[in-house]
Amino acid sequence: MTHITLGQAIWASVRPIIKIYLIIGVGFGLCKMNILTVQATRSISDIVLTILLPCLSFNKIVANIEDNDIKDVGIICLTSVILFATGLGFAFIVRSVLPVPKRWRGGILAGGMFPNISDLPIAYLQSMDQGFIFTEAEGEKGVANVIIFLAMFLICVFNLGGFRLIENDFHYKGDDDEENTLTNDDSAQQPTQPIEGNSSSSSNQDILKEPNESTVPNSSQASYISEKNKKEKTELSVPKPTHTAPPAIDDRSSNSSAVVSIDSITHSLRTNHVDAQSVSELNDPTYRTRSQPIAYTTESRTSHVHNNRRNSITGSLRSIDMRELPAEGMSDLIREYSNVDQYGRRRKSSISSQGAPSVLQADGTISPNLTRTSTLQRVKTSNLTRIITSDATVSKKDIETSGSSLPKWLQKFPLTKFFVFFLKNCLRPCSMAVILALIIAFIPWVKALFVTTSNTPKIKQAPDNAPALTFIMDFTSYVGAASVPFGLILLGATLGRLKIGKLYPGFWKSAVVLVFLRQCIMPIFGVLWCDRLVKAGWLNWENDKMLLFVTAITWNLPTMTTLIYFTASYTPEDETEPVQMECTSFFLMLQYPLMVVSLPFLVSYFIKVQMKL
């Protein structure tokens, strides 16, 4: 056994942190330069979830897990349950004793319960398998162990509905049955006079005012607008993503927006009552009526105009041109990930809500090209595809609608929808990869088709004397290698968009205490749990030191960054007080600086004292 000095142990524990934070810093810089926009972040995140991470999971498990490792898999599952329960318990204590906003009482439980078990521990292990502390083979097996931890994390967050802790914090306007029955057609037929709090936002159509319209009686506003529009002969024909304002426009309107938002153009097309001059003025905040469902304060109105201007500009610019704009922030992240409107109803696809040129005709009807959808199109737009190809698009409505295609007598069982929802989430690419890889790894003669080890039987090889299916391992190894770097870059970009707003009085105490418990006290529990596993005879330091090491560091990981995506997905796009996002941002931003000290301290102690190196 190699013996190292304390200085060597400290350096071995600090060096991986340097690499990790350099990669996170790259993501942070790309975010600030607008190279990694929120749209690009989401696209890369979905690529990681659907391709890169499943390939990495399959490759590491098949290559490094044997049939005699079933006991280790069971220990990992048990450890995961204890880890999640401990974090949940600490969060519940903090929530009960210290001030926490009522609108984040579930979010703090999720933040305490679920750690970031994916890119961070894998990157850390891959920096320590150079032979100084662990061999390359031990490092590979450690990565496989982390992936099994990740599988347990996915089961608890998605399959078992852990995301509901976050969703329960959100209470939307008009939750009563009457308002929930409103449709886009209903909102289009609303009278033009402003009615406080009685407008549906799902249609994304704003009621407009002319500059002097505030002086016109409410009863004559409709005729006023109609009479004004009769004087113009110009009508909009085919919708376009952008619309340049006419030359004859005042400075105020010109300064307000260089181009017109897609939402405004869609409104013009569907009503056919707004002329070209009116369209050019839609982004001017003075034309917005007070009938918006959320009242405008000075701050919220400024933010709303800023978002409209950004939406207008980004709709007509190339991605390289967007780098000249200010860096995207938390409001842009909400705009991209938000899946609900103010009434809690799922936001419709931008294709149908914004009226893309290929979808809406000049008369506002749906193009025949969209109605003749192919099988591929139906698959792409199905709820199942949405669930399994993204990380923050599920909600309680997906649970309620699960099993709706089953026979009526089967739907009567209360657990049917939960069972179907559980199975749906098992179809996630990463979950499928782990399940398939474990089946292959536990059947020696099947595993021999992919890799050759001392425990696999001798079977006929390919012409190059390699296993017949080794090309699959080559593919998954090559593609999966990009998963961890991309994951850390996305982590840096996400942290770069977070902003600490006005916090709930006293909440900083709750956040600081919970972060201290998670990253300073819970690692002690992890070390004690490892010691208990050895004393119980389940593991030993000679053969299972990598599993014990992985178990220890998982107790010192920060909260999952998926928390910010889930919170954004349940936040309405035009929310003026995103309390949940502000609390989540503050809570996450406290943890990553502390990890620079806490994780190397834990690793140094574990190497010198527990492993006795």
UniProtKB/Swiss-Prot annotation:
The chain crosses the membrane at residues 10-30, 74-94, 106-126, 143-163, 432-452, 471-491, 546-566, 587-607. Residues 187-206, 213-226 have a biased composition (Polar residues). It is found in: Endoplasmic reticulum membrane. The keyword Cell inner membrane does not apply. Keywords: Cell wall biogenesis/degradation, Endoplasmic reticulum, Membrane, Phosphoprotein, Transmembrane, Transmembrane helix. Signal peptide: none annotated. The keyword Metal-binding does not apply. One of its GO terms (biological process) is cell wall organization. GO terms for cellular component: cytoplasm; endoplasmic reticulum; endoplasmic reticulum membrane. Residues 177-256, 345-366 are annotated as: Disordered. It is a multi-pass membrane protein. Its main location: endoplasmic reticulum. InterPro entries: Ecm3-like, Mem_transp_PIN-like. The modification Phosphoserine is found at S291, S338. Pfam families: Mem_trans (PF03547). It comes from the Eukaryota. May be involved in cell wall organization and biogenesis. This is Protein ECM3. The lineage of its organism: Eukaryota, Fungi, Dikarya, Ascomycota, Saccharomycotina. The gene is ECM3.
